[in-house]
């Protein structure tokens, strides 16, 4: 039997991304974010999520994409990275998908040149669209994840 992947899909601008659902704890609406002095540029700040303070990363900034204002559709994907809870701002969360692992192909060089290719697991072909698969464990390298709780 072919291996099946379960992914949460989301958008940043015109691109659609997917992340392993196993790393996602929850998806929340955009709360008020408290800025943190001297945090890395891609760290938007921290939020209080049911009594727990978690750092929030703006994935647009992390991927060096143009930054836009939050909308009613903006969400924070709360994930566990390196044993730490981190929120990641995305434009919209689309759906939960199941797909055959065999449908994932290597990331084309043109796509990899726009986003650090070390963040990418590959590209999945879906009905008429492409989904860029991210490796959340690499979106924030180990040292950056270790530093995040110190920010919060």
PLM-predicted stretches and their roles:
Residues 1-152:
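An acidic, low-aromatic, low-complexity terminal/linker signal
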């Amino acid at each position: 039997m072919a291996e099946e992947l379960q992914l949460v899909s989301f958008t940043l601008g015109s691109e659609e991304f997917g992340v392993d659902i196993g790393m996602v704890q929850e998806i929340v609406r955009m709360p008020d974010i408290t800025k943190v002095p001297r945090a890395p540029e891609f760290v938007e700040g921290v939020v209080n999520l049911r009594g727990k303070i978690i750092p929030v990363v703006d994935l647009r900034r992390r991927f060096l994409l143009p930054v836009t204002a939050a909308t009613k559709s903006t969400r924070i994907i709360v994930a566990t990275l390196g044993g730490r809870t981190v929120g990641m701002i995305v434009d919209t969360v689309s759906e939960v998908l199941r797909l055959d692992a065999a449908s994932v192909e290597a990331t084309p060089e043109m796509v990899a040149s726009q986003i650090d290719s070390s963040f990418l697991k590959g590209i999945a072909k879906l009905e008429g669209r492409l989904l860029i698969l991210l490796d959340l464990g690499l979106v924030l390298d180990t040292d950056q994840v270790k530093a995040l709780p110190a920010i919060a």
